[in-house]
Each structure stands twice: as structure tokens, then as C-alpha cells.
């Protein structure tokens, strides 16, 4: 028998970070990081390339807050290019301050260029801009979509995400090599969970590695296929290789609380990709639904039947199958409506700042060097959550 046990896998709920002596206040920490070899972020947050999470409104919001959004690919090439152009044509605070300081700009202008009123300049003083002063944006493509990549690059996209459920595969590597040989663009490749995959993708030109097979709330890959590595262990394994090449790791999936972001970064990620937490915000493209007195937004995995029918089948090697022959690796569901994304991101960033303060880390690079963790038991997890009391007033950043 060739099967071997390569060890225990840990995920976010299995560990707690250990506090250090600190002279660092949360408000003083720097959250700047690398998305790829050549593209930076002001905050280490990325909205996922899902058709119920990121189109131009989400991407604009993320970039204005210092992160980045990845436009999903479940649309034709022209539509995806237009989504990228809407982000690039959005008037940033920098441009407003220089050219239209007193102008009240509508969210959607009549000439097709998207703009937004400058109601809260403090919230958007950390914008993630390219070298022309435009908001940064990424876009996802699948295997062999060279023409799509070319059109996106011509539209000014800042990064291409070559997206697959199994990034350590022949056609992904072939597509990566072709893009890198023909275009001057940074490419993130995923998803992977092993040292071998990380090394091979980097050696073939990857500028960023996306880590995670099956940790997402709407993903069933680990149950349907029996494949995956718990996310903390996957990040550790992949970052141990990527760090030697100076290539950033993006932790994709499994984030439920702000504390999980700190854990992902502490074990080696440079940024995290988020889906479900942002799916309930106003800026996501998911439809609203009122059930009783509660508003929800539609949210589905890219491995669900609905998403695969709309164009993500190639991500799961099922692009040519009829619906009744598809084997889904995700579900369709709903999440509670949360209002505008600014408040959600504020809580995530605030929790991360607190984490770094506890660990005495003024930067993400310091966090890598100073962090240590303990494995906890189910009793330790139970103790970590609210217990022996009934919550009578909900808070934005916690639910059990």
C-alpha cells in the first residue's frame, strides 16, 4: 500500500496565538502587505472571485478601504472587462481632492463612469491605488483563457487570478507559463495546499499563491471528494516554501472571525481572501430576500450546480457536463444582510490590529517573526466562546 500518513492538520479553531510583551498599540500597527511580488495592499483583505461576492461595487469598496477585489469570471469576457473598467474609472478621493473638491458626485454617473459621493473621507483615506492614481482591481480567469487575460490586461487590471479547485495540475501550469510569456502582469495561482505545489507554481512564474482546498463555508470538496488539508497547516506548509522565493501567500477560505485573520497571517500568509463575511453586505451582487423579519442575501459556492452552469464548471473540471451529470463541490444558500461593507471591514481590521497589539507586532513581517501558538482542546474552544450566559444584544463582530 502506498498511502501514508503525513501528520495532523490544524485549522483556525484548533489554535490560539500566544501573547507577547508589547509596546505596540493597535492603532499604531501597519497593515501594509504584499498581494503579489509587485502589487501591494494597504490592508491584507481580498474579496473573493465569486459571483455572489465580487463585481465592481465590491471591488471599489475594497480598494477604497485599502484592500482589493477580484472580479469573478462567471460572465462573458466583455462583461468582465467592463466590470474592471468601472473600477478603474471610479473617481478616487485623490482625484476628487485635486480636481473636484466641492463636487457632489453620484454613485452612478450618466456617462457610464462610476463615481461615489465623498461622504466619509476619513474612511477612504487609505485607498489602494495604482501608479496612475486609479483604484486597484483583480480579475479571475480559468484554464486556457488566454484571450480573456489579454483583454483584462488591456483594460488595466492590476492582477490576474488563475483560479482552479486544484491549482497543482498540468493545464494550470501550461496556462500560467503562456500568460507570463506573453503579458506583463502579475499572476496569482491557486488553489493549493502542499509544499510541492507551491514550489512548482513559483518555478513556473506565479507571483502569488492562493492556499485552501475545502475550507470555505459553502464548499463541500472535503466531504464529496475526501480531499484537502486543514487551513492553518496548509498555510504553514505553503508559506515555508514561498517565503524562500519572496512570493506572498493568500489564505483563501475558512475565515469566520477577525481572530482567524490574525491566525492566518501569523502562520505565514501575507493576506486573506474572504467570501461569506462579505456576501451579506450591500455591495455584493447576491439578491436580497426577506424571510420573516430578517433580510438575507443569496450566496453560493463556485462549485455549486448553479455557479457551474453559469461558467465555473472548468474550475472543477466539469465544464462540458450537463446539469444532471454534474458532481457539485459546493452549495447554494443565504447569509444575513449586514448593510454596507465599510462597517464589516472596520471590524475585521480592528480585530487584526488588536491581535497584533497583543503579540507586540507593529507590522505583518514582525507578526511572522514573533508569533507562536498553542493547540487547544474542545474544552479550550468552548471556554474561548461566550459561555454560561444568554446574549441579549447582538454585536457586529461575534456570533456563535
Curated annotation (Swiss-Prot):
Entry's EC annotation: 1.1.1.205
Regulation: Mycophenolic acid (MPA) is a non-competitive inhibitor that prevents formation of the closed enzyme conformation by binding to the same site as the amobile flap. In contrast, mizoribine monophosphate (MZP) is a competitive inhibitor that induces the closed conformation. MPA is a potent inhibitor of mammalian IMPDHs but a poor inhibitor of the bacterial enzymes. MZP is a more potent inhibitor of bacterial IMPDH. Resistant to mycophenolic acid (MPA) inhibition.
Residues binding NAD(+), per UniProt: 163, 212-214
Chief location category: cytoplasm
Basic and acidic residues compositional bias, start-end: 96-116
Keyword set includes NAD: yes
SUPFAM superfamilies linked: Inosine monophosphate dehydrogenase (IMPDH)
Residues passing through the membrane, by range: none
Function: Catalyzes the conversion of inosine 5'-phosphate (IMP) to xanthosine 5'-phosphate (XMP), the first committed and rate-limiting step in the de novo synthesis of guanine nucleotides, and therefore plays an important role in the regulation of cell growth.
Subunit text: Homotetramer.
Family: Belongs to the IMPDH/GMPR family.
Protein name: Inosine-5'-monophosphate dehydrogenase
UniProt organism field: Cryptosporidium parvum
Amino acid at each position: 500500500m502506498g498511502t501514508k500518513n503525513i501528520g495532523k492538520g490544524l485549522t483556525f479553531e484548533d489554535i490560539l496565538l500566544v501573547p507577547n510583551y508589547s509596546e505596540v498599540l493597535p492603532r499604531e500597527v501597519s497593515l501594509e502587505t504584499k498581494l503579489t511580488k509587485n502589487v501591494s495592499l494597504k490592508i491584507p483583505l481580498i474579496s473573493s472571485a465569486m459571483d455572489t461576492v465580487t463585481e465592481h461595487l465590491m471591488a471599489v469598496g475594497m480598494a477604497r478601504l485599502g484592500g482589493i477585489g477580484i472580479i469573478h469570471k462567471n460572465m462573458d469576457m466583455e462583461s468582465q472587462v467592463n466590470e474592471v473598467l468601472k473600477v478603474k474609472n471610479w473617481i478616487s478621493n485623490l482625484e476628487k481632492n485635486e480636481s473636484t473638491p466641492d463636487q457632489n458626485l453620484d454613485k452612478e454617473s450618466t456617462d457610464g463612469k462610476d463615481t461615489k459621493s465623498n461622504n466619509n473621507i476619513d474612511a477612504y483615506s487609505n485607498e489602494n491605488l495604482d501608479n496612475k492614481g486609479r483604484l486597484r482591481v483583480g480579475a479571475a480567469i480559468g484554464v486556457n483563457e488566454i484571450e480573456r487575460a489579454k483583454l483584462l490586461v488591456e483594460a488595466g487590471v492590476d492582477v490576474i487570478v488563475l483560479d482552479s479547485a486544484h491549482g497543482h495540475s498540468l493545464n494550470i501550469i501550461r496556462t500560467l507559463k503562456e500568460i507570463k510569456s506573453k503579458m506583463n502582469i502579475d499572476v496569482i495561482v491557486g488553489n493549493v495546499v502542499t509544499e510541492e505545489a507551491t514550489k512548482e507554481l513559483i518555478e513556473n512564474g506565479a507571483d502569488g499563491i492562493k492556499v485552501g482546498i475545502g475550507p470555505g463555508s459553502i464548499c463541500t470538496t472535503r466531504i464529496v471528494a475526501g480531499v484537502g488539508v486543514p487551513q492553518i497547516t496548509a498555510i504553514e506548509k505553503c508559506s515555508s516554501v514561498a517565503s524562500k522565493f519572496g512570493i506572498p501567500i493568500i489564505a483563501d477560505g475558512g475565515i469566520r472571525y477577525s481572530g482567524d485573520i490574525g491566525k492566518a497571517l501569523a502562520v505565514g500568509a501575507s493576506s486573506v481572501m474572504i467570501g461569506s463575511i462579505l456576501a451579506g453586505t450591500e455591495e455584493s451582487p447576491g439578491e436580497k430576500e426577506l424571510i420573516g423579519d430578517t433580510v438575507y442575501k443569496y450566496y453560493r459556492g463556485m462549485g455549486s450546480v448553479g455557479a457551474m452552469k453559469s461558467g465555473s464548471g472548468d474550475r472543477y473540471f466539469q465544464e462540458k457536463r450537463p446539469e444532471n451529470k454534474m458532481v457539485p463541490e459546493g452549495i447554494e444558500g443565504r447569509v444575513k444582510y449586514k448593510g454596507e461593507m465599510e462597517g464589516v471591514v472596520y471590524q475585521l481590521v480592528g480585530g487584526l490590529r488588536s491581535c497584533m497589539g497583543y503579540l507586540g507586532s507593529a507590522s505583518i513581517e514582525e507578526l511572522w517573526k514573533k508569533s507562536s501558538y498553542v493547540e487547544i482542546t474542545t474544552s479550550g474552544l468552548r471556554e474561548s466562546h461566550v459561555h454560561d450566559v444568554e446574549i441579549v444584544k447582538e454585536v457586529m463582530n461575534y456570533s456563535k
